[in-house]
């Protein structure tokens, strides 16, 4: 058989194999078109489970007369116009093939009118070449689509349709999902002339919960925990059923939406399941209705023929964000309120969060300043006249006692500046200018070695080895523990009994290294890590660290810091001159012993005399 171009109708029927799976698929595509057109009311009329008639009527913006023929053509759409639009899709439809595909396997009629037009127009396609005929019609502003005799010209597809009741149940489920996605739209569903579902548009939270109960049932509404979780461009809201009271009937309620688009995404389901797994039985599933809002540039919706799945550019971030949002709500449900104290405790000192250069991890913290006055004055200040607990005229609730005459002598004494005594001269011998320096960086060799010039000699320094020694110094606690940096999204890992025992045994030492965690029955949650580890792949590093600890019988902070320093990934696969100079400056400041006595593998002298002698003999 020779290669030939397929006729338009046959090409559309092939595309319909992906777009039009059953009558519910037609309803989904057409209702989503109505929502994209700005409709606030959509009426869906079904006959014989959709096999005989599917009629979708909306009050959207309508379609202009000159665009009706294009609306039934393949790859014609008003949703996108460029690659930039495709990479940031905000509409439900965008491919421009739904109407063409549906019209190729049914008798489709499109009637529409815009607010600017005096009359409506009707279009339908027929024949082998799918020629479109347009004629006047009577219709209010909006659009009506009638799909008659679905699969009438493809008997094989029609044979695979189920019973009328089954097909209508699939349509009913689609409308339920859409009703949960768009609370601001009225949806009316009729079957064989009888109104079956009526979801009125709602705006207030209480009304939304009533619609939620009408769709998901009262048992779900009674156990639903509201979620409102946000970070940057990510927002998670909705409801999740309390896992402690989840029944078999509730487990069928699993609705998830990404930017208003209904989804069945395994990554999202896994994150929710992981957050609830400690409270669910082996045969139980979580029940939820969740809405994820994300920057359209960070999600690709064009990865599934029926648009049931999406692909996130930062899937791990999205997974952990959803997991933490659901987990926080479940934890709030189980937490009990702590009794309030009369006097607030002193605020915990948090060290300044800067890029690691070494000094911030080991600097002695200054005394923290009081964030607020205590509820009751700690000192009476002598005879205060009983005014310490009253508000001042300015309205300050905790005004301090004024200047007392009895304290005048004390204040004057404190204000006197003592005469400075001359400091004794230092007897420390002056250091040579090059004694605490590796020398001058000449160039980078091989991507990971620095060629140095020092006191007339040339040396080759391994930058990865120097970086490892620097990391070890940054991770080794000095007079105070290493500053812990809280993780935005804590890392939750499953551990064995031996690993859990090792972690509990080493918990205090890990705390000195800036690694903070909490453990439960079978899991450990990493809450904070030291700053040098913030950019590491903790999904790999932390499990390896736990495995290392489980193999040890005794623990020491130096050994743990050394292991971490050897196993962290370098941030510089290829070193530049600026990066090498910055690294050596940090090493010279934090690891001066490396300059005095370089360890093996760090420095290698370069013998220039042999090369010079070889040149002289030529």
Swiss-Prot record:
Keyword check for DNA damage: yes
Gene that this sequence comes from: mutL
Similarity section: Belongs to the DNA mismatch repair MutL/HexB family.
Entries under PANTHER family matching the protein: DNA MISMATCH REPAIR PROTEIN MLH, PMS, MUTL, DNA MISMATCH REPAIR PROTEIN MLH1
Protein name per the record: DNA mismatch repair protein MutL
Functional note: This protein is involved in the repair of mismatches in DNA. It is required for dam-dependent methyl-directed DNA mismatch repair. May act as a 'molecular matchmaker', a protein that promotes the formation of a stable complex between two or more DNA-binding proteins in an ATP-dependent manner without itself being part of a final effector complex.
Keyword DNA damage: yes
UniProt feature, compositional bias: Low complexity: 366-381
Keyword list, A-Z: DNA damage, DNA repair
InterPro entries named among the record's database cross-references: DNA_mismatch_repair_CS, DNA_mismatch_repair_MutL, DNA_mismatch_S5_2-like, HATPase_C_sf, MutL/Mlh/PMS, MutL/Mlh/Pms-like, MutL_C, MutL_C_dimsub
Secretion signal, residue range per the UniProt entry: none
HAMAP family: DNA_mis_repair
Gly residues composition-biased segments: 382-392
């Amino acid at each position: 058989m020779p290669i030939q171009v397929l006729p338009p109708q046959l090409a559309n029927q092939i595309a319909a194999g992906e777009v039009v799976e059953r009558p519910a698929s037609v309803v989904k595509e057409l209702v989503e078109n109505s929502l994209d057109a700005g409709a606030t009311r959509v009426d869906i009329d079904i006959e014989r489970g959709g096999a005989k008639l599917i009629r979708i009527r909306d009050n959207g913006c309508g379609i202009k007369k000159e665009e009706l023929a294009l609306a039934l053509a393949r790859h014609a759409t008003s949703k996108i116009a460029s690659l930039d639009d495709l990479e940031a899709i905000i509409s439900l439809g965008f491919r421009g093939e739904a109407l063409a595909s549906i019209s190729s396997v049914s008798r489709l009629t499109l009637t529409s009118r815009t607010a600017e037009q005096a009359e409506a127009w009707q279009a339908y396609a027929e024949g082998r070449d799918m020629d479109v005929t347009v004629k006047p019609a009577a219709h209010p502003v909006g659009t009506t689509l009638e799909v008659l005799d679905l699969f009438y010209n493809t008997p094989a597809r029609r044979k695979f349709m189920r019973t009328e009741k089954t097909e209508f149940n699939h349509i009913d489920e689609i409308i339920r999902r859409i009703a949960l996605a768009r609370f601001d739209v009225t949806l009316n569903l009729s079957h064989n002339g009888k109104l079956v579902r009526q979801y009125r548009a709602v705006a207030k939270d209480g009304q939304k919960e009533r619609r939620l109960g009408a769709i998901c049932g009262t048992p779900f509404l009674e156990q639903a925990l509201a979620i409102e979780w946000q970070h940057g461009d990510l927002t998670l809201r909705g409801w999740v059923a309390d896992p402690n009271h989840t029944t078999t009937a509730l487990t069928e309620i699993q609705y998830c939406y990404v930017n208003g688009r209904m989804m069945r995404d395994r990554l999202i389901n896994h994150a929710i399941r992981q957050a609830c797994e400690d409270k669910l039985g082996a045969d139980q599933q979580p029940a939820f209705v969740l809405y994820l809002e994300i920057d359209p540039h960070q999600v690709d919706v064009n990865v599934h023929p029926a648009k049931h799945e999406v692909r996130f550019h930062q899937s791990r971030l999205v997974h952990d964000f959803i997991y933490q949002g659901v987990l926080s709500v479940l934890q709030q449900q189980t937490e009990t309120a702590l009794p309030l104290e009369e006097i607030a405790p002193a605020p915990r000192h948090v060290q300044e969060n800067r890029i690691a250069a070494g000094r911030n991890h080991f600097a002695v913290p200054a005394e923290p300043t009081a964030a607020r006055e205590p509820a009751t004055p700690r000192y009476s200040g002598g005879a205060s006249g009983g005014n310490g607990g009253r508000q001042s005229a300015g309205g300050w609730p905790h005004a301090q006692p004024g200047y007392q005459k009895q304290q005048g002598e004390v204040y004057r004494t404190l204000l006197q500046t003592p005469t400075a005594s001359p400091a004794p001269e230092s007897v420390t011998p002056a250091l040579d200018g090059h004694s605490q320096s590796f020398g001058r960086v000449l160039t980078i060799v091989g991507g990971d070695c620095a060629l140095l010039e020092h006191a007339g000699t040339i040396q080759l320094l391994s930058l990865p080895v120097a970086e490892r020694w620097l990391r070890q110094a940054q991770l080794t606690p000095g007079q105070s523990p290493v500053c812990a940096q809280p993780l935005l999204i804590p890392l939750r890992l499953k551990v064995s009994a031996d690993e859990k025992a090792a972690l509990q045994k080493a918990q205090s030492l890990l705390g000195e290294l800036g690694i903070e965690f909490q453990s439960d029955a079978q899991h450990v949650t990493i809450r904070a890590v030291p700053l040098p580890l913030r950019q590491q792949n903790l999904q790999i590093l932390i499990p390896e660290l736990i495995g290392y600890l489980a193999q040890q019988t005794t623990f020491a902070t130096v050994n743990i810091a050394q292991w971490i320093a050897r196993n962290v990934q370098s941030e510089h696969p290829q070193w530049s001159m600026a990066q090498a100079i910055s690294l050596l400056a940090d090493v010279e400041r934090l690891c001066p012993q490396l300059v005095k006595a370089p360890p093996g593998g760090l420095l290698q002298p370069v013998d220039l005399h042999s090369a010079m002698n070889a040149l002289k003999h030529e």
